[in-house]
Amino acid sequence: ENERGRITIDGLDFNFTRKSAKKAKIQELLDRILLNSENAIVYCNTQGNAEKVAKDFDRAPLNTAFYKVFLDHLLRNFDPKWIVIEALQKGVGVHHGMVPKYIQKEIISLFNSPESGVRVLTSTTTITEGVNTTAKNMIVYKSEKGGGRYGKPLLTFDAKNIAGRAGRFMEHYTGRLITLDKEFMNVINDTGEQITHKNYDLNVEKKEIDDEMTPEQYLDDRSRERLLQIRAMQEARGIPDQILSQFKVISKRDKIKIYDNIAALSPLFHQRIKRFIARLNAPRMALEKDGFQVILDVIYEVVENETLKAMIENTFKDNYSPNHYSILFAALNSYLSTGFNGVYNYNLRRENNPNSSSAVNSAMRKTSSLIYNTFKYQLVKYIGVFNLMYKFYISERDRIPYEDATGIDVLLIKLEYNAFSEEARIASDYGVPQKIIDYYDSPNQNEANRIQGSFDGYEKTIFERINNIINK
């Protein structure tokens, strides 16, 4: 029904009179939904929009006693102007890929608890990735994934997946879908293209990386020729399948290029790598500039990610030598030395107005993207391949078993888990505050006791939970 801006959707009345802007429409929608004692997810196409919607929503002060311990933990460890904190103080959860995993989990738990008062969730597509919620209402901000030059229209499958988040988790018989972008309904009502897989379609042109995973009957002549070339290159170098088949996101040809680059290094450069590995395995792990630069030069030609490639290309002049080094070294060394907060503080100082909430949120997104995307995913996969090829080269050169060759495994483990011991890695995978991971990685019991004694109320609760899992 529609009479002068008044609309009824599934028994709920909304008044959009003189509310043409999205901000005003979302305010009206959420106000009415909350008055009806319901909850809602606002799907946003970007992290920035998810944060903006949370910031713009005006809500009366909320009694946060239910999650005071969690809120106190956030205030103790993060800037109070961070939108995740500001939003929670008014009962709104912000959920996207740049929010630390343990905070994402806690926000979903609060949203699913009626007594918490967290009744609104602003989110990107992370809400469709294995997350169950009690949402009654789904509001679509924009019918896209991403924004700017990286933005893509939602497919019918995506749209139905988003819409399907409303009325789930055995909580509601039906859900309510409301969209602020009419294109969303065009997409969701479309039959959509049949979902196909390039590995099972002879008519789809494949990249070299797809060839290995495509059944024989779906390969064209070009793919077959490439596979023969790769097999010949592999056999000429004697690289076993079990080594070349790891890190499937990088093509075998690129792995062989990395192997060839390692084999072509001079004795001086091999000595630098050896020194780099020795420093990694010292009691206090450290990055050695010259060896790390050799590794970056080895992998550079196969790196496809624009951000990582730029960080390798751009260099700085060393104060203590005539050499130039990749800024990736400086950034990674800073992270390993000072952690998330150290990188965040550096990024915040570079913002135009460091005291503003917009600067805080921008610095948090940049820091999270650098650590979680560039370091822990992009860099890990390339130096992971370097590690495979380097250890194989050393095992052949020195005629020792592959397992006895020393590589950069310590750095890979540190980047992937930020932890070394098995218990610490389990905790990291589960998603816990860093202090709990540090507890399990403690070099001795005295240090473990010191860290445990510094746990705040929230960390104590999570520690008990993960400790029960580890000690089962």
Protein language model regions, located:
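Conserved interdomain linker/interface between the two RecA-like ATPase lobes of SF2 helicase motors
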Residues: 1-56, 93
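Amphipathic alpha-helical transducer elements in NTP-driven molecular machines
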Residues: 47-51, 104, 152-160
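Charged, low-complexity hinge/linker segments at coiled-coil and domain boundaries
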Residues: 59, 63-82
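Conserved helicase ATPase core of P-loop NTP-dependent helicases/translocases
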Residues: 77-124, 172
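SF2 helicase motor core recognition
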Residues: 104-108, 121-138, 164-174
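Conserved segment of the helicase C-terminal RecA-like domain
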Residues: 133, 141-146, 152-196
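Long, hydrophobic alpha-helical segments
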Residues: 186-239
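C-terminal accessory/interaction regions of large nucleic acid-associated machines
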Residues: 220-472
